[in-house]
Amino acid sequence: MSKKLITVGIPAYKAQDHICDCLASIQIQTIRDEVVVIIAKDNPKDNYDFVKKRFPNLEIQILDCEKNTGPGLARQRCADAATTEWITWIDADDVFYDPFALENLKDGITQDCIEVRGIFCQEIDPNPMKVRAMPRMDEGHPWVFGRLYNLKFLKANEIKFSALRAMEDGEFNWKIRMSIEGFPLKINSVEKVVYLWRKGSDHSITRIGIEENDGEPLYNWDLCQVGATAAAINAIKFCKKRNPFNGSITRFTVEMFVDKYFTYIQCLEKKPMFAKENFFNAKRFYHECYKEIENQISEDILKKIYTMHYADHSSDMVGIIPSLTFFQFLDKIKSEDYRGKEEFDEIRSELPEWVIELDMKSGVLGEEGYVYVIDEKK
């Protein structure tokens, strides 16, 4: 075990032009001497040796790679190489919010704590109010931004990033939240901003298609939802194998299925081009996860969870008159055939060619054009 406390893992893909901003934000940390930086290359042609000379006061390790695998597996290589007690990750085009960010996360560590959550800000385009960063206060967000994780806990519970290239951090975090059910383990929060999520580099998959898609990233209603569905299915199946009597899994499954309804209804209104794809995502989640527990969930419980989630989505639903009630949505899913990849391919074939071309650049769907989940037959 290293004498240092925290590893800062950085997945780096074609990041030579902007990684120095990220490293500079680590250089100024008040607890810099307790930190190890591990850069996991995700492009074999990249060379980051220059950063060791530019930041001589940082302990920096650079991990090579044979091929591009996506941010999840790059982060995992950081975790595998780390010898500290704690780890946090930061994208190469992001920065820590201020010099106290890592100290604030450290101060959140208590006995039996396996994760510390800070607040992150999202950089936004200039606007009349001159606001550049918007705090994101939703503690349950699925990303790894501004969070500190206990490595011993992760390794003991075999919680790792998968090969997913979209919402891979959602799968990772959902595994953690369901795994601590029934154990005296804590996820602590610190009410301080620790991380700035910047707008991203031009090759970021979360930015692809902005110009072609009326100013909104293509990712939001498309591959993000495909990835989130696969991530949730994988997390549920992983946790069920480890503890099939975990009630947290059932609750999470119901909540995710209800969320599929709101995603579909909003997509119909805001981006109908992807409505069929999002309905498929809901069908997939139903058949892979929800169907198995459906008989355990009463209509009253469903109504309560629906009401809670409607409140969460209230601002997103302004001006939208749902074409289906939740229970009509459920009946529609149950009444239609589900054909897995064959059905997904048919839906994708109806999308404009420019969407297919941009999605291919992201690599999310892989060579087979489909994201397989745990135990799914090919």
Language model features: what each stretch is:
Residues R177-I180, C239, Y261-E269, I333:
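Generic structural signal for hydrophobic core residues of well-folded globular domains
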Residues N173, T250-V258, Y286, L302:
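Short runs of predominantly hydrophobic/aromatic residues within well-ordered alpha helices
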Residues L223-A230, F252, E277, E342:
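Alpha-helix boundary/N-cap detector
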Residues M1-I233, K237-F245, D337, R348-W354, ...:
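Nucleotide-sugar donor-binding/catalytic module of glycosyltransferases
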Residues K45, L268-K378:
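Membrane-interface aromatic/basic loop that binds lipid-linked glycans or pyrophosphate carriers
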Residues F55, N157, S248-F252, C289, ...:
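Residue-level recognition of alpha-helix termini/interfacial anchor residues
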Residues P71, C113, P128, W143, ...:
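General helical secondary-structure elements
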Residues N246-P272:
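P-loop NTPase catalytic cores that bind/hydrolyze ATP
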